[in-house]
Amino acid sequence: MRTQSIDTSPEFERIQIARIRTFSAEKMFKSVRSWTQSITSANLHSAYGSSDNMQERDLAASFVAREYGDYLARIFFTAIEKRPEWRLQPPDIQEALLPILDVAKYLNVPALLIGSVAGSIYGFPRSAQDVDILADFHTEHVTSLLEHLAHSYIFDPHVLTLALQHHTSFSLLHVSRLIKIDIIPHSTVFENALLERRQIQPLIEGREPLLVASAEDMTLLNLIQYQRQGNNADDRWNDILGILKVQAHILDLAYLDRQAQRVNVEGLLSQALIDAGIHNEDGSLSQMPASIR
């Protein structure tokens, strides 16, 4: 088994995995929320720690430019200039996520959580730079989206409208939390199938459970992205291994194998199963310790 870090022994990692398996989905989400808030807050202030006189608006705009690019930063700065009441708030993914979930519910559009947030619920929790949601909004939703999102998010209305017309993704930036939400439409047969195997997870106390892609589908989505990144994104590979290790005892390996062939990542899946200690080098099922099975 390849460990998540070269400094961690397989024995200690097995203890970690056994402990993570005792955590509820809500606790895992809280961990991702806490990690994200701590690391994003540090990144927000790190480059400007000595600039005590920097205005909060300039600090926020500089952070947005550094993390998300100049285009979104310009839209952001223009928008907050029109909001004298604007104040920077802690970068909380839960608070950044709730408004779009409420709008999706209002429009009766299923919103499926994917990306690093969903992956961390099944594997080793880590911080998330943004939140990815699979949601099939259409042109008939434009007016409602523009009306209901404008208070909570920064976005280009023209870009959003074009995205719905052409069935492409679009981004929202929470106005005070500075967390980016990427909305991704169902554009492939595989993405359409994700909803069929969705998991209903109680992630937020006092809220209805959220729809989350299954552990198997999160593995496949990460493998597809890893392949697109040239098979050399170590962080994403660690995410893949984390899901496989933590979920090894309940994974549907037959489904994983079938779907991996359909999306052309069967070779990567084979290597991931070996690195995660689930398969031997010859492809046979590994005799994993009880703490891993």
Named regions from a protein language model:
Residues 1-85:
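N-terminus-biased detector of the onset of the functional/mature region
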